[in-house]
Amino acid sequence: MKQLALVTGGAASGKSAYAERRIQEMFSAAKLPEKRLIYLATMFNDGGPEAAARIRRHRALRAEKGFETIEKPCDLEALLSDNRIWKSQEGAAGEYPAAPKGVSADLQGGFILLEDLGNLLANERYLSEGRLSGVCADPPMRVEEPNLSAPGGNEDRQYYPEDALLREYILAPLLTMAEAASALVIVSNEIFSDGETYPPETMRYIRALGLLHRWIAEEADEVTEVVCGLPLMKKGRIGEG
């Protein structure tokens, strides 16, 4: 694996701006101008005004920074091999001027900013083409896991059918991408601290995102939470002992 970083934060925390600076720092430090600086956008564009406004805002943030954009709301595995992915060069006004181009060679050794993990998970769960959509309504199962501190040496835990699929369809492609790229920075949302209890389906989504955060953090060189624009290092710093 090359360089893998996870950046989390609440809404309007400054996580996107920090993640952009971080991937640009990695790109500059590597001194590999022949490699690509890639923005991997996972938001599903439904053509509505809210989606258009968010796209315009993020395009403005990245204006003239040299990013190439790949739009892929779900099915990251296809991104690693499929030649029907749409890619665009940042900077043009209006909608993305997209053209079909295989991206496998582009990803190899590239510096990739993925924004964001929460959208990717939601799309895999709720879009008709999402590969988790068929199992997310299945009831949880109870399993016993070894736990020496629990009575009898075992602990009852809930297991959801999509847990293994989260690893297969989201985590594994992300780790493959990180291995192929020079650097991968993943942006995600901090949605775990408000103390509220939501409907079961929402809580199930929150749980799934938490699992992904935990698994990615275990593999990452660097984990940062951004609060009020300030990066709080949770794990490591790439390039530092």
Regions picked out by a protein language model, each given a short descriptive name:
Residues 32-34, 62-64, 107, 179-181, ...:
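Short, well-ordered coil/turn elements that cap or connect secondary structure elements
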Residues 19, 58, 113, 189, ...:
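Residue-level signal for inorganic ion chemistry
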Residues 4-6, 36, 109-111, 183-185:
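Residue-level preference for the first positions of well-ordered beta-strands
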Residues 2-102:
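Conserved P-loop
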Residues 65-165:
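Helix-adjacent hinge/juxtasegments
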